[in-house]
Amino acid sequence: MSDETLRAIARNIIAPCPPDERPLVVWHGGEPMTLPAAWYAQAFALLEEEGGGPPLRHAFQTNAVGVNASWIDLWRTWKVNIGVSLDGPADLHDSRRRTRRGKGSHALAMRGVSRLQEAGLPFHVITVLTAQSLSRADDIYDFFTGQGIRNVAFNVEEEEGQEGGSSLLATSQVAAGYTSFLKQFLHRCAVDPEPFHCREIEGVKGLLAAPHDQRAENWQVDPFRIVTVGVQGGLSTFSPELIGATAPDYDDFVFGNVRDGGVQSMRDSDAFRRASDDIARGVAACAAECRFFEVCGGGAPANKYFELGRFDGTETLHCRLTRQITLETVLDALDAGVFDHSSQEGFLHDRSGSADQRARTGSGQR
């Protein structure tokens, strides 16, 4: 990404934001560490200088393979939020994360994790669950705790653009397998004497604490809540995974260029307007049909597009697993008292909380 593009991002995206709504800049898509740490140090400084206002927040999602002293210094200096892509034990991780020479990357990733731990830099792990992962809840839990990793989020393997199909779509018992995995992982969290932070548990905890009339925020269906900038300055919004996908009807989801302006340049795009209208129809359909709408907010446009081939559809496998089954499974665990007397802080609860959440979503219906 050129300095010209960085300056345009600062001028057209960052500077217009009110001081109390400074954006989080997420460096993602591909592997951000293919560029040297020195490049990011200059880029961060340029964005600060050109964008004005309070300090920006930055986040990296990385495979951690290249972590060294330079990266440690960068992330510590700029207080960067670090996410590491790590799929559990070596055999699971290496089955889909390989080096350019075709070798497994697990050992290299763990070397990076060790360096982060030695430096005292906090990080979280994102683990992609494949069909092969679903029977391995204990192995995955034991691996993470054995490595001193206690902050994990699960993504399910998705159908995304030209990346190929998800192994979960080819598994007829995927719902049962995912439910079984999550139940066992929740059990392990509950009986562990040390706290284990799992996004899926804490997400439901947040729903239980929310006001009864408050629908879950879904930034992916609201235009411009997320703005994605490609390496050449192409602008997109909605789901970040959309940019670059082949979609002639939507100009491959490139709705403008940051060098030509910010949000307004996207508003002027016919392709953006078509996508926005179609996504809105999909959200309305979800609201009309789905008893989980209050806790989902209309699904992820990228998953609808890649699974269904359209934005105005409703349920996807991604939604069924990560929203519906996750909610039901965690609420079942709460109702069963799985987290009573647990080390998981904040899950000592009035039993009416989970029952009330079922009433709000209709998820008590079977």
Regions found by a protein language model. Name each.
Residues S95, T99-A107, S114-L235, L242-V258:
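Radical SAM enzyme [4Fe-4S]-AdoMet core and its adjacent flexible, acidic
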Residues P18, L121, I149, E194, ...:
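Generic structural signal for secondary-structure transition and capping sites
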Residues G362-Q365:
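Acidic, carboxylate-rich catalytic segments that either coordinate divalent cations
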Residues A8-H28, G313-R360:
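Short Fe-S-cluster ligation motifs
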Residues M1-E4:
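Canonical Radical SAM [4Fe-4S] cluster-binding loop centered on the CxxxCxxC motif
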